[in-house]
């Protein structure tokens, strides 16, 4: 989405609407062919556009697809990879985009920070408001844009950190964040609040996304046009995904053997039944008070919950291993596309077009979902998935050829520009430092 770097600034291009000034000094307007050529040519990183498009297509599948649970012997179930991993791919892409709009490989100077932060703030608010509108339409899905807007704002303090420091900050959040959130949920006996649901306990959790945003920002400071860098990104991502998946499966089997009363399938079933029973009875129970607090805490099965916060591979569980697995998949996808997207740029043009306007494509998908399924309704039909994908690919390619930047991407770019212009320009400082190495 635009939050994943939708407009031309986010990918480092000069946009696709207007050609450079002609030799005579008059600006020459681009035709369809020139717009499409600019879409897949440097300085735009078309691999990132393709990655965004794949994330959108995966999100559409998660919303409307009829996908069976994963079974190694059932090829159709491999499509279940879209659940959870599509949104995590967006998280890494959002971090890359934040790095690109704040200097690419060059760390921004202190004098640049006020305008850069104001611009990110304006973009984040615009994305948040668009997400609110979509939520109020009753789409029946967990709209990602409100959380995306928060992510852009949360990145303001760290835009001057070097890649090594971004990674050092991401690691403890990924390792400890899920456990701390689960612990706080248990200590509060699962209390609910809209703010906590937005950033900590909902489908999109800050403790899951923050490490991936920081990872993406570190990637965005790297020379992504170098094949060696792309190959290392793909290799590291593949290794992380395989190791996290293997570790999750092995630990689940080991704990189920060593402590079946806590981690075995019967214990999981009993925990689910207890949740249902508690939900059915809580309306008639008065406040428990401190006398019943310990008993209520024990009934939540802390050992099970804390273990799941580390080893669960369930989509949107927010566990430590889910972060490493989904982050690894995202790196593998991005690294692989950095290697092949440029040579295959014309073949991948429709995906590049969709990925250049992901906020628009995502929003159109949600509006179409409301039209087809009614407010609050849902669909599980792979034909709808295919039709939605093809329709968006054609529409986005046509719009890119005729108009360039997507309509909602124009809105967020305008908001970012106006917010940045509202901050007085700082006095010129010393010469900029060299690019990050």
Where are these regions (language model features)?
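Alpha-helical transmembrane segments and their immediate juxtamembrane cytosolic regions
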Residues: 2-10, 15-437
């Amino acid at each position: 989405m635009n939050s994943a770097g939708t407009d031309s600034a986010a990918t480092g291009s000069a946009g696709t609407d207007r050609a450079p000034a002609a030799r005579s000094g008059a600006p020459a307007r681009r035709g369809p062919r020139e717009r499409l050529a600019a879409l897949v040519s440097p300085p735009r990183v078309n691999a990132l556009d393709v990655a965004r498009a794949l994330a959108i297509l995966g999100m559409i599948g998660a919303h409307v697809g009829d996908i069976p649970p994963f079974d190694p012997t059932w090829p159709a179930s491999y499509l279940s990879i879209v659940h959870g991993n599509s949104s995590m791919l967006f998280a890494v892409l959002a971090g890359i985009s934040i790095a690109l709009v704040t200097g690419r490989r060059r760390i921004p100077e202190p004098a640049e920070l006020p305008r850069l932060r104001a611009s990110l703030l304006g973009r984040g608010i615009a994305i948040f408001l668009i997400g609110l509108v979509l939520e109020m339409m009753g789409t029946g899905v967990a709209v990602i844009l409100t959380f995306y807007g928060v992510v852009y704002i949360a990145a303001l303090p760290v835009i001057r950190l070097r890649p090594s420091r971004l990674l050092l900050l991401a690691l403890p959040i990924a390792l400890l964040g899920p456990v701390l959130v689960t612990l706080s949920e248990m200590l509060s006996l699962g209390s609910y609040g809209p703010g906590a649901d937005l950033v900590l306990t909902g489908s999109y959790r800050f403790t899951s996304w923050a490490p991936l945003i920081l990872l993406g920002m570190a990637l965005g400071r790297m020379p992504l046009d170098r094949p060696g860098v792309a190959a290392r990104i793909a290799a590291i991502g593949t290794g992380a995904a395989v190791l996290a998946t293997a570790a999750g499966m092995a630990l689940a089997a080991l704990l189920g053997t060593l402590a079946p009363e806590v981690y075995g399938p019967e214990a999981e079933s009993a925990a689910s039944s207890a949740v249902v029973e508690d939900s059915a009875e809580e309306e008639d129970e008065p406040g428990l008070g401190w006398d019943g607090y310990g008993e209520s805490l024990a009934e939540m099965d802390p050992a099970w919950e804390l273990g799941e916060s580390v080893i669960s591979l369930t989509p949107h569980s927010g566990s430590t291993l889910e972060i490493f697995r989904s982050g690894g998949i995202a790196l593998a996808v991005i690294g692989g596309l950095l290697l092949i997207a440029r040579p295959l740029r014309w073949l991948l043009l429709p995906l590049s077009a969709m990925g250049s306007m992901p906020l628009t494509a995502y929003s159109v998908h949600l509006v179409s979902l409301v039209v087809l399924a009614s407010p609050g309704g849902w669909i599980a039909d792979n034909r709808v998935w295919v039709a939605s994908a093809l329709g968006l690919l054609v529409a986005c390619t046509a719009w890119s050829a005729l108009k360039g930047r997507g309509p909602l991407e124009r809105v967020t770019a305008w908001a970012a520009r106006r917010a940045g212009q509202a901050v007085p320009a700082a006095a010129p400082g010393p010469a900029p430092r060299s690019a990050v190495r």
